[in-house]
From Swiss-Prot:
Its main location: cytoplasm. InterPro entries: ACP_syn_III_C, ACP_syn_III_N, FabH, Thiolase-like. GO terms for biological process: fatty acid biosynthetic process; secondary metabolite biosynthetic process. One of its GO terms (molecular function) is beta-ketoacyl-acyl-carrier-protein synthase III activity. CDD domains: KAS_III. GO terms for cellular component: cytoplasm. The last Arg residue of the ACP-binding site is essential for the weak association between ACP/AcpP and FabH. Its EC number is 2.3.1.180. This is Beta-ketoacyl-[acyl-carrier-protein] synthase III. Pathway: Lipid metabolism; fatty acid biosynthesis.
Length: 325
């Protein structure tokens, strides 16, 4: 019998500190950096974001999202036999956030590892978990996107520091006799490493190079719109479906203009676009599972709906997953 995988539970968590554009602008003004609510909303669609407290880590955020996803799936933590965490902001250089989170869940033994594809991380992680379940290597996988991007922001650069937020989202992916994950399409092109990166690295007890995020916004925008369309069309072709079969488009929540452009290229009405970037900002690998969980819990996404998940991020990486919820 053919083995498939499907999502059986979703969960998410945002740190309680919500920062509006006006509040962020006031904090930046003290440092001599000028911005405003109008400037941010016009260019990004972002109105607020959440920042974690200094002592809160990606594993802390991921733990809360994981607990909610496990509960939604009707499982216990001990039922999980695979943990994959997509993150670019780990608690430490090593071991992985997944191993730390596994211990916090009170379980041991199952494989646990991190996956780093920046803002594409969740679609990469979901694809890997799907493949492992189909191969028989796992039956109940916990797939998490968790980030504390506030730690790597340059608050003297108004073009980047206003974009990002912290948070976590998670899904439980279980073995199934009927298809849930219908198709996926992943890509990368390393020649674009420099347009979105944190170039610093640790050497001899010191950080060499900048430990803060740097981005060429125009280059990212130009690349993102094209590759998101191509990845979406590739997954549809693999699944034998059409754009009109998509019930909900859940893209990486980076910028409202990119999201609207992608929907337009796929000839999807904006009513089919799940948007959380206005309240969450760009939470990198956490953005897609955060948006998915919010859409499920609000009643928008229902069982049987066809969902297109899309991510694009540093690397340059991009990809899409088409699934039946």
């Amino acid at each position: 019998m053919t083995r498939y995988s499907r999502i059986t539970g979703t969960g998410s968590y945002l740190p309680p500190n919500r920062l509006t554009n006006a509040q962020l602008a006031a904090e930046l003004a003290v440092k001599g950096v000028e911005t405003s609510d109008e400037w941010i909303v016009e260019r990004t669609g972002i109105k607020a974001r959440h920042f974690a407290a200094p002592d809160v880590t990606s594993s802390d955020l991921g733990l809360e999202a994981a607990k909610r996803a496990i509960e939604a799936a009707g499982l216990q933590a001990a039922d999980i036999d695979l943990i994959i965490v997509a993150t670019s902001t780990p608690d430490m250089v090593f071991p992985s956030v997944a191993c730390i989170l596994q211990h916090k869940l009170g379980i041991a033994g199952c494989p646990a590892f991190d996956l780093q594809a920046v803002c594409s991380g969740f679609v990469y992680a979901l694809t890997v978990a799907d493949a492992m379940i189909k191969s028989g290597a796992a039956s109940k996988a916990l797939v998490i996107g968790a980030e504390v991007f506030s730690r790597i922001l340059d608050f003297s650069d108004r073009t980047t520091c206003v974009l990002f937020g912290d948070g976590a989202g998670a899904v439980v992916l279980e073995a199934s006799e009927t298809p849930g994950i219908l198709a996926s399409d992943l890509h990368a092109d390393g020649k674009h490493v420099g347009i979105l990166c944190v170039p610093g690295h640790v050497s001899g007890g010191q950080v060499l190079g900048s430990p803060l995020l740097t981005m060429d916004g125009k280059a990212v925008f130009k690349l993102a719109v094209g590759v998101l369309e191509s990845a979406a069309r590739a997954t549809l072709a693999k699944a034998g479906l059409l754009e009109t079969d998509i019930d909900w488009l859940i893209p990486h929540q980076a910028n409202l203009r990119i999201m609207h452009s992608t929907a337009k290229k796929l000839k999807l009405p904006l009513e089919k676009l799940i948007v959380t970037v206005d309240e969450h900002g760009n939470t990198s690998a956490a953005s897609i599972p955060l948006a998915l969980d919010e859409a499920v819990r609000s009643g928008k996404v229902k069982k049987g709906d066809i969902l297109m998940l899309e991510g694009v991020g540093g690397g340059f990486t991009w990809g899409a997953v088409l699934l039946k919820y």
